[in-house]
């Protein structure tokens, strides 16, 4: 059997084995894992002499592990496994044979031994640590820990045990944690003194002999210290051993692996300080350990001081020491801010804070960002503490300037790009992203300082920015771009203090002192020669700042032409990233300065002309045969989407009130005509399904719609101050609508063309107004086709709601004409079967938009169109769909809306209220529909009971209650319109037909006649719940 298992493992791991045979071998080994007796064969395979191959032994032990952890080995058998492995360990590790197992096997054995410890240490293997310690000596008579291979294995298990029961980062169930806590208690009672003594012996005897042993031992001390008696580690013997290892930091040249020992020794101190204890004890511990001196010595060591700013600088040690500084300062601050801490302790903590401030600054200002990031948490805690104090006593803010000033200066310095950075390079993107993330974190710290001492922050930043622009004035393009970028970045952040409600000004005056300072900075920046901004990073910063502080230009209008000229240079930038971002920012700027840019409209349109040429690119055209073609296509899409901002900017500029309508049309035609020609040129090819031509027309239509969006912010029914453009301009945009419709009618089978046309339609409403109404049938015919998705229908319905709301006085005849064919397409979309979750979501959305459309028609006094002679044939379908939706147990939102539509129909067509107290004082908006009262009673009323009669209906569900409230509202509306006729119907037919008893009927009818609309809406859900009618 053993040979069979060994052969199977060998075959399964052999890459050149026959695939069929290999599959059989895999299956055999996997069956072995679940076989209750499989572990016995594998244990024997692992411990055999002579040893099997490494892969056989590894897999064999893995099977044993799997069986043990999977519960296939009972306690008695676990003892057998323990005895077998212990005998193996004594044979291989206990005699310093010199040929111990490779690391992967050692780790696997350690894992097994750790599991056995968890299972048997409490009962069954009480001598666990004695047995393992026995491996650390070459013979029972040895008086020292002299067996290297045994020591390494012992420490490997020690560290594994911590991972199993002591590591707080490991997620455990409640039972697992309870077991871990019990095991820790047992260790502390039985063996802790013994274990810590072994660490001291190992560190003493192997201090210079074996770096691997010393490193592993230090890691064990550092990990276990968090849950053992601190006195077992913090004692003179152990500290002397630790200090000796720290001394390695003073060596100029370390042998390979020695730096790991040094760093592990520092980590021990970090773990000691990280141990939970009272603030008073922690402060005393920091003083006792003399951490200030330790950190000073480490900071002044050759790797961190002598080699700083050279390629030999030891960043690993710097980060390790920074962790020690960080955890120490966090505890110092905690002692300062916690209530109940003695005055004496706080005084000691204050002294420590002053002592550690140079250490904070040293590592916070480290040129390596990962080192700086390591101490950000303690800086954040410190500033949070100082901010809290300043709020309680603002006078203390100035006293803390000695702390805040150097931190602020360090923050600003760290925000500067370092000398090795190369902005914009493809292979630098990760570094750039990490640096920007660091800048964000530093920005938060800077905001905290501003909140503590605003005056200090303003003075430091203002001085830095002013000095930078003065240097720029003197040195021009010779200035290091990093310095200018830093100043601009600080200007951008300064707005957090200066800008209120999106502006630097309130009633024409600067918001505050910060706004005054920022206005001075803006003057310096804008009056600088942009040619001095030679680097793309600074050029982008310039545009971002101009947009963020556009309110500045409202009060310095003479500077606008120069700024626009600078922008027009940047929108032609050779670097794509700068160019496309500038397109967006240019649109933002002209939108915010619309009223001031009319005098340069012609110049701008001409300057942008070459950028308004649309070139659609298919993936194959971008990089044929390249695996990255999809990314290139996304890039091409992103570039076009950015280009649209230019079309919007042109629309904004051309629409300024200072330009006469004829000039507006002239500028518009300069942009529109090339697009019309392009559409005409590509239309025939697009009809032949040429993909590039179809995409080109999609882009053209999107550009036309975006131009319209820029031209007018007005939307029908909105309370915006904007108005429709002049008639001449609307006529020009009528050409846009016509060109779009021609393309749509020819290419309505294309989803992309429909999408672009729907967008254009939504924007053309704002520039055409009611002129668009006669075209509605053509828009509907093109946008709602046999291939249109439910999503498309829902989006268009939403647009129609807006049109109805905006033009309710003019749309009746057109709506009357198109309603039946339009709704037939919607019904078709609703009736189509769904094939997945996405389909179901789209169907639900379409149902809601259909109901919203009906509400829009009814709410805008257009309900007559639904019952007109032309649309009478579809009326029954409209009603039946609503009835169906009102009974949908799986979609309460739609059901609620369905009842709202039925209530609105009832109030619109049911005639005047016959119940005086039910009237809300507003007569029905439309003429009553003959016979509709009886229709409401017989068709609508039973629906109120349909949904709650469903077996799966839960009346306690919050959404269900809302549906019932809406159903109750419908019943009250029917009663208001029909009075006693409805009550009689309920008494004699509807309620008895449902099996309701006479007493309940009278109570229900009484409530209906007695309560007002609001009262009955509340009553109906409670009624159903209390009367248990749900089973009827």
UniProtKB/Swiss-Prot annotation:
One Pfam family it belongs to: Xpo1
Annotated localization: Nucleus; Cytoplasm
An example molecular function term from Gene Ontology annotations: tRNA binding
Family to which this protein belongs: Belongs to the exportin family.
Annotated protein name in UniProt: Exportin-T
Annotated keywords: Cytoplasm, Nucleus, RNA-binding, Transport, tRNA processing, tRNA-binding
Gene Ontology annotations for the cellular component aspect, listed alphabetically: cytoplasm; nuclear matrix; nuclear pore
SUPFAM superfamilies: ARM repeat
Its job: tRNA nucleus export receptor which facilitates tRNA translocation across the nuclear pore complex. Involved in pre-tRNA splicing, probably by affecting the interaction of pre-tRNA with splicing endonuclease.
Keyword Cell wall biogenesis/degradation found: no
Stretch forming the signal peptide: none
Domain of life: Eukaryota
GO biological process: tRNA processing; tRNA re-export from nucleus
């Amino acid at each position: 059997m053993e040979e069979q298992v060994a052969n199977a493992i060998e075959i399964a791991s052999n890459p050149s084995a026959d695939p069929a045979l290999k599959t059989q071998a895999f299956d055999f080994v996997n069956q072995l894992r679940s076989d209750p007796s499989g572990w016995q064969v594998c244990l024997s395979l692992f411990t055999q002499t002579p040893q099997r191959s490494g892969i056989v032994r590894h897999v064999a032990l893995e099977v044993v592990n799997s069986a043990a952890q999977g519960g296939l080995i009972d306690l008695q058998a676990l003892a057998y496994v323990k005895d077998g492995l212990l005998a193996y360990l004594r044979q291989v590790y206990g005699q310093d044979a010199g040929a111990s197992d490779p690391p992967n096997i050692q780790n696997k054995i350690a894992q097994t031994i750790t599991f056995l410890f968890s299972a048997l240490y409490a009962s069954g293997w009480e001598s666990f640590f004695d047995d393992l310690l026995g491996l650390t000596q070459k013979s029972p008579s040895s008086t020292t820990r002299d067996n290297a291979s045994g020591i390494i294995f012992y420490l490997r298990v020690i560290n594994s045990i911590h991972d199993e029961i002591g590591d707080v980062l490991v997620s455990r169930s409640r039972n697992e944690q309870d077991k871990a806590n019990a095991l820790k208690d047992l260790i502390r009672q039985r063996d802790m003194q013994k274990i810590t003594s072994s660490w001291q012996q190992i560190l003493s005897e192997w201090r210079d002999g074996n770096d691997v042993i010393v490193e592993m031992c230090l890691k064990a001390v550092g990990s276990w210290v968090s849950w053992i008696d601190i006195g077992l580690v913090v004692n003179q013997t152990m500290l002397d051993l630790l200090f000796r290892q720290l001394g390695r930091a003073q060596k100029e040249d370390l042998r390979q692996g020695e730096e790991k020992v040094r760093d592990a020794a520092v980590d021990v101190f970090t773990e000691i300080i990280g141990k939970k204890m009272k603030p008073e004890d922690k402060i005393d511990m920091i003083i006792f350990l003399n951490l200030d001196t330790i950190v000073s010595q480490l900071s002044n060591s050759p790797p961190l001081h002598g080699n700083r700013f050279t390629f030999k600088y030891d960043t690993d040690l710097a980060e390790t020491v920074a962790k020690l500084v960080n955890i120490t300062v966090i505890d110092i601050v905690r002692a300062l801010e916690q209530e109940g801490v003695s005055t004496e302790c706080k005084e000691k903590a204050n002294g420590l804070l002053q002592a550690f401030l140079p250490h904070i600054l040293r590592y916070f200002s480290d040129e390596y960002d990962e080192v700086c990031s390591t101490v950000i948490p303690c800086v954040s805690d410190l500033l949070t503490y100082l901010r809290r104090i300043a709020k309680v006593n603002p006078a203390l803010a100035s006293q803390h300037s000695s702390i805040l000033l150097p931190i602020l200066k360090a923050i600003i310095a760290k925000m500067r790009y370092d000398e090795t950075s190369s902005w914009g390079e493809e292979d630098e993107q990760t570094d750039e992203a990490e640096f920007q993330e660091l800048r964000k974190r530093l920005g938060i710290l800077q905001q905290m300082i501003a909140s503590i001492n605003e005056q200090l922050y303003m003075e430091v930043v203002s001085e830095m920015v002013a000095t930078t622009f003065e240097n720029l004035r003197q040195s021009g393009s010779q200035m290091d771009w990093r310095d200018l970028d830093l100043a601009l970045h600080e200007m951008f952040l300064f707005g957090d203090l200066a800008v209120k409600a999106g502006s630097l000004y309130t009633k024409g005056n600067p918001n505050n002192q910060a706004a005054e300072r920022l206005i001075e900075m803006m003057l310096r920046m804008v009056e600088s020669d942009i040619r001095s901004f030679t680097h793309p990073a600074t050029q982008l910063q310039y545009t971002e700042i101009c947009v963020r502080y556009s309110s500045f230009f409202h009060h310095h209008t003479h500077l606008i032409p120069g700024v626009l000229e600078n922008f027009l240079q940047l929108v032609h930038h050779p670097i794509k990233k700068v160019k496309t971002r500038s397109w967006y920012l240019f649109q933002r700027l002209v939108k915010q300065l619309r009223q001031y840019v009319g005098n340069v409209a012609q110049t701008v349109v001409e300057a942008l002309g070459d950028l308004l040429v649309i070139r659609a690119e298919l993936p194959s055209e971008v990089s044929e045969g390249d695996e990255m073609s999809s990314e290139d296509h996304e890039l091409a899409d992103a570039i076009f989407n950015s280009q649209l901002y230019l079309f919007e900017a042109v629309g904004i500029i051309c629409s300024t009130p200072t330009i006469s309508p004829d000039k507006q049309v002239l500028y518009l035609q300069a942009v529109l005509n090339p697009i019309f020609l392009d559409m005409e040129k590509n239309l025939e090819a697009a009809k032949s399904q040429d993909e590039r031509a179809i995409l080109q027309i999609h882009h053209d239509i999107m550009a036309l719609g975006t131009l319209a969006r820029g031209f007018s912010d007005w939307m029908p029914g909105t309370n915006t101050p904007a108005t429709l453009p002049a008639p001449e301009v609307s006529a020009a945009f009528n050409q846009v609508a016509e060109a779009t419709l021609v393309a749509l009618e020819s290419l309505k089978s294309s989803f992309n063309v429909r999408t672009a046309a729907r967008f254009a339609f939504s924007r053309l409403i704002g520039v055409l107004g009611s002129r668009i109404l006669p075209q509605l049938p053509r828009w509907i015919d093109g946008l709602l086709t046999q291939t249109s998705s439910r999503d498309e229908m829902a989006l268009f319905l939403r647009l129609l709601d807006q049109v109805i709301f905006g033009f309710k006085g003019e749309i009746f005849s057109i709506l009357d004409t198109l309603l039946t064919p339009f709704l037939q397409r919607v019904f078709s979309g609703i009736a189509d079967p769904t094939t997945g979750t996405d389909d179901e979501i789209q169907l639900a959305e379409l149902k809601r938009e259909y109901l919203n459309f009906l509400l829009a028609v009814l709410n805008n006094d257009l309900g007559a169109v639904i019952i007109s002679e032309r649309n009478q044939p579809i009326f029954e379908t409209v009603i039946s769909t609503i009835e169906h939706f009102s009974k949908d147990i799986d979609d309460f939102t739609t059901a609620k809306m369905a009842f709202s539509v039925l209530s609105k129909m009832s109030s619109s067509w049911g005639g005047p209220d016959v119940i005086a107290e039910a009237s809300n004082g507003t007569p029905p908006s439309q003429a009553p529909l003959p016979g509709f009262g009886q229709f409401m009673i017989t068709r609508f009323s039973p629906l109120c009971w349909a949904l709650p009669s469903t077996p799966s209906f839960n009346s306690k569900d919050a959404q269900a209650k809302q549906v019932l409230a809406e159903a109750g509202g419908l019943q009250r509306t029917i009663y208001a319109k029909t009075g006693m006729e409805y009550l009689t119907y309920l008494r004699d037919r509807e309620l008895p037909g449902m099996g309701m008893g006479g007493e309940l009927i009278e109570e229900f009818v009484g409530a209906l006649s007695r309560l007002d609309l609001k009262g009955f809406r509340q009553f109906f859900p409670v009624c159903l719940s209390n009367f248990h009618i749900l089973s009827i």
